[in-house]
Regions:
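Flexible loop/hinge segments at secondary-structure junctions
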Residues: 1-279
């Protein structure tokens, strides 16, 4: 059985116990949290192997057929370029300026109403975005005051979607100038429908994700329940296939998974061969 739950939901199910009624593996678009590891221990899931399967980037994307224009009505031929601070200002609940348009944030940006569809709290993409963008882009005053940098505004300019990326595409296609937050693999497989803004002047690319020069790059993981190894038929066949050269250099690469560096890959293979507990 394969079930789509989001990273948070997957860890919750994975940690609930050992046995055929519980998952063997959970995929996660961010590292397991300490509180999730503690939940696993409470559920009797004591031995866990962490597998870093590749890298990903988070795209701040809009409809591919939308033409951005500056405040003078002139076409922005190079697309739109946003900083983490500008995205935070557009999305943050505790931004006292409460901008209505991107122009309200910076005069170089278009007079287009801010409309952003964000992943739900259960999503690992949401966790990674909040850590890499909302927290990093948070204004100094908020950090000093120990405010909640990751809280989204609730006035209609930011809405939460579900786990189905297709709904995000539908939203930004209908509402021109709207943004959605996607993983790179989804962007790369839907370039006819969606395009990504630059972040801090850097375009999203496979190379930029692999070397982390793209500002919203992140690792991807799955977690193996060691108690199921040797009990559940085919479990290690699946794991070994997932990290094989054939997969990572062929069909997973075609699907948008960005490869690990040789050094990182060697560590992953060693951890799998020795079924090394990650904690």
């Amino acid at each position: 059985v394969i079930e789509s739950t989001g990273s948070g939901g997957g860890h919750k199910l994975f940690c609930a116990g050992v046995g055929v009624e519980h998952p063997d593996i959970t995929n996660s678009s961010r590292a397991q949290k300490d509180k999730e590891f503690a939940l696993c221990q409470e559920g009797g899931v004591n031995d866990i192997v962490e597998v870093r399967v590749g890298n990903d980037g988070i795209a701040f994307a809009y409809s591919a057929d939308y033409e951005w224009k500056n405040s003078n009505g002139e076409s922005m031929a190079d697309g739109i370029d946003l900083s983490k601070e500008e995205i935070w200002q557009a999305m943050a609940k505790d931004n006292s300026n409460a901008p209505e348009t991107w122009f309200d944030i910076d005069k170089r940006l278009p007079k287009v109403e801010i409309s952003i569809m964000a992943p739900p709290p259960s999503s690992g993409t949401r966790d990674a975005f909040d850590s890499l963008v909302m927290k990093k882009g948070c204004v100094k005053e908020m950090l000093v005051a120990d405010g909640d940098c990751k809280a989204y505004r609730e006035d209609g300019h930011v809405i939460e979607g579900g786990e189905n990326d297709e709904l995000y595409v539908e939203h930004i296609s209908k509402e021109q100038g709207a943004f959605g937050i996607f993983g790179y693999s989804f962007l790369s497989n839907n370039e006819d429908k969606i395009a990504a803004s630059k972040i801090n002047g850097v375009e999203i690319s496979m190379e930029g994700i692999q070397d982390y020069s793209y500002p919203i790059a992140r690792p991807l993981f799955f977690y193996i329940k060691k108690a199921h190894v040797g009990v559940i038929p085919g479990l290690m066949d699946y794991v070994n296939e997932f990290v094989s050269e054939e997969a990572t250099e062929d069909y997973l690469l075609d699907a948008g998974l960005v490869q690990l560096s040789p050094a990182d890959r060697a560590k992953v293979l060693d951890d799998i061969a020795n079924l090394k507990n990650y904690k």
